[in-house]
Amino acid sequence: MLIMLTSTLILVLMVLLAVAFLTMVERKTLGYMQLRKGPNVVGFMGLLQPIADGVKLFLKEPVWPLAASPILFIVAPIMALTLALSLWMLIPMPQSISTINITLLVIMAISSLSVYAILGSGWASNSKYALIGALRAVAQTISYEVSLGLILLCLVILTGSFSLQAFIYTQEHTWFLLSSWPLAAMWFVSTLAETNRTPFDLTEGESELVSGFNVEYAGGPFALFFLAEYSNILFMNTLTAIMFLGPLGSNNLNILPIINIMMKATPLIILFLWIRASYPRFRYDQLMHLMWKNFLPLNLALFTLQLSLAVSFGGAGVPQM
């Protein structure tokens, strides 16, 4: 029990540290793409900028609207960050802290609960703008979870298990990225929408609006939402690396599994940032059209194909008990 608590605490601290420096990497990346330096004053080449930002936010006085629901107003950001950090307990690096065989189902269940944090924050603010932003965010998140779920089902048919360890064993010789690249492309776009990133950042719309569901938040509670968003970005790209980019270990290269997964997840994270610098924002109707009229029929067709191939060739992948 003590070992598990210690492991969880270390994992949470490492994730929060990674999130802090991801914000600096994003600002640096966007800066160089716009022919400027980015943060370069606090510390060597701006390395301490995330620490300064965090200290500034958490030292601010907590304020909220007079007519807001104070308990739910504070609970919502705490819930968002707790759910985002709890997902990391399921990632095998090379062993996960939580040993369950239905990892993917639990991941989908926990990520679906983040909808309640968004909706609760918008409703508790007692602001019509925050509530409209929350409803818009919830509709977007729920829509793209349908796509993510169908893609996961297609891959589960190939592996024969809901465990992430099964994905590692199945991809010993061939990555799913090569054999199932349409699924990988749709998965990547769906993770962009699920994490509310450009070009699907209709939730916030920073260049047009002040913010979305968190428009009334400032200081510490706002920082918790910020940490939850970037933790989800790191998690989704790590999950993508495990599901589509092969096993954690390597028979040919003598490198640690954690280094291997970082080498595969980092280019995906940089691609997230690159997309923010390059693409304009979708209209909301285009966002929904892409999901319900493009991704959903294609996902259902691929799911039917995978299912029929599995039955035709004598069953799905070998179940990993």
UniProtKB/Swiss-Prot annotation:
Which reaction does this enzyme catalyse, per its entry? a ubiquinone + NADH + 5 H(+)(in) = a ubiquinol + NAD(+) + 4 H(+)(out)
Q: Which GO terms describe its cellular component?
A: mitochondrial inner membrane
A Pfam family this protein belongs to?
NADHdh
Q: How does it sit in the membrane?
A: Multi-pass membrane protein
> Which subcellular locations apply to this protein?
Mitochondrion inner membrane
Kindly state which keywords UniProt assigns to this record, in alphabetical order: Electron transport, Membrane, Mitochondrion, Mitochondrion inner membrane, NAD, Respiratory chain, Translocase, Transmembrane, Transmembrane helix, Transport, Ubiquinone
Listed EC numbers? 7.1.1.2
Among PROSITE patterns, the record links this protein to: COMPLEX1_ND1_1, COMPLEX1_ND1_2
Instruction: Look up keyword Electron transport and say if it applies.
Output: yes
Q: What class of enzyme is it?
A: translocase
Keyword Translocase, does the record have it? yes
BP GO annotations = aerobic respiration
One of the entry's Gene Ontology molecular-function terms is: NADH dehydrogenase (ubiquinone) activity
InterPro entries attached to this UniProt entry: NADH_UbQ_OxRdtase_su1/FPO, NADH_UbQ_OxRdtase_su1_CS
Give TM segment ranges: 2-22, 71-91, 100-120, 148-168, 173-193, 224-244, 255-275, 295-315
Q: What does this protein do?
A: Core subunit of the mitochondrial membrane respiratory chain NADH dehydrogenase (Complex I) that is believed to belong to the minimal assembly required for catalysis. Complex I functions in the transfer of electrons from NADH to the respiratory chain. The immediate electron acceptor for the enzyme is believed to be ubiquinone.
Write out the similarity annotation: Belongs to the complex I subunit 1 family.
Q: HAMAP family, per this entry?
A: NDH1_NuoH
Name of the molecule in the record:
NADH-ubiquinone oxidoreductase chain 1
